[in-house]
């Protein structure tokens, strides 16, 4: 399939345990700073564990500054990151040529753990999306993608295809998830949690460290040479198991091959591989 529109990533932002904003996160990474700390909050886990949590005090301050402190925590993060993207780019969601994609695996799942002032339906992804889109007056142009660990990649591919098919000129893609008791107990049941900082692909690896974050990018059909180009992407389904991919790697192989074909890229052209593996045990 030949595409005539190029999709650029023109702006980005991120909130994580390493900081608020892309620059703070970059500086922390360049300084070899880790966001992983020992967590003892019973709302997160029954027993202490190593994880990366963002500053609740800073989140509360920023949420109060824009009047969203009454929203669930996940929605606060989405609104803050999207707001920052709008501030950077000048692109508003009231513009009907701009779409909004929210990517998450669990959304407001933390609301299940305790009684709150929020209605029961707040835990549903559609309600989370409705609240966030309502804040930005974009109720008719919000889409939610929840596809386990590839939710973010799936959302970027969906945004790219929307631009290529002329549905939108620009798309804000935001993704986020929180650390909650639901999440830690789930990974704990798989015995996937490490008691030390994780060592991906190391011979002595023994699990992962969980974390929470929220980020957003602006995809656009217009850009310059200084912008990142989203040149190819693909999603496959190996129909293996709900909690694990095929051991033969067929699904991953098909997705990589299709993405490279779409981008017109050969294996020898690849200089960096960003790999993801849950616990990699």
Predicted feature residues:
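Condensing-enzyme catalytic core mediating Claisen C-C bond formation in acyl metabolism
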Residues: 2-15, 22-51, 193, 197-265, ...
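Conserved catalytic cysteine-centered active-site region
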Residues: 3, 37-76, 107-158, 167, ...
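Conserved small-residue
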Residues: 11, 29, 82, 100, ...
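Acidic, glycine-rich active-site loops and adjacent beta-strand->loop/helix elements
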Residues: 14-15, 104-107, 147-151, 175-180, ...
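Conserved active-site "lid/cap" helical segment
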Residues: 23-103, 255-267
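Structural element of the ATP-grasp superfamily
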Residues: 82, 132-133, 218, 256
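Beta-strand segments within the central parallel beta-sheet cores of soluble alpha/beta enzyme folds
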Residues: 99-102, 143-146, 171-176, 227-233, ...
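Hydrophobic pocket-lining residues that define ligand/cofactor binding sites across diverse proteins
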Residues: 162-163, 263
């Amino acid at each position: 399939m030949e595409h005539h529109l190029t999709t650029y990533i023109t702006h980005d932002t991120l909130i994580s345990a390493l900081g608020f904003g892309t620059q703070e996160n970059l500086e922390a990474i360049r300084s070899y700073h880790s966001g992983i700390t020992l967590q003892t909050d019973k709302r997160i886990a029954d027993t202490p564990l190593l994880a990366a949590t963002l500053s609740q005090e800073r989140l509360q301050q920023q949420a109060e500054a824009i009047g969203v402190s009454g929203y669930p925590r996940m929605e606060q993060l989405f609104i803050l990151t999207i707001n920052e993207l709008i501030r950077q780019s000048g692109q508003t969601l009231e513009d009907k040529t701009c779409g909004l994609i929210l990517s998450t695996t669990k959304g407001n799942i933390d609301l299940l753990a305790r009684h709150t002032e929020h209605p029961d339906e707040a835990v549903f992804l559609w309600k989370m999306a409705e609240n966030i889109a309502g804040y930005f007056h974009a109720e008719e142009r919000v889409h939610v993608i929840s596809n386990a660990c590839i939710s973010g990649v799936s959302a970027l591919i969906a945004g790219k295809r929307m631009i290529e098919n002329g549905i939108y000129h620009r798309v804000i893609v935001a993704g986020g998830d929180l650390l909650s008791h639901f999440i830690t107990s789930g990974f704990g049941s798989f015995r996937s949690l490490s008691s030390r900082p994780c060592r991906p692909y190391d011979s002595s690896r023994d699990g992962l460290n969980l974390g929470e974050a929220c980020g957003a990018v602006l995809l656009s059909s217009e850009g310059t040479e200084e912008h990142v180009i989203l040149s190819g992407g693909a999603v496959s389904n190996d129909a293996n198991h709900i909690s694990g991919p095929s051991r033969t790697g067929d699904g991953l192989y098909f997705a990589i091959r299709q993405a490279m074909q779409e981008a017109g890229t050969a294996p020898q052209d690849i200089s960096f591989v960003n790999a993801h593996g849950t616990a990699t045990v």
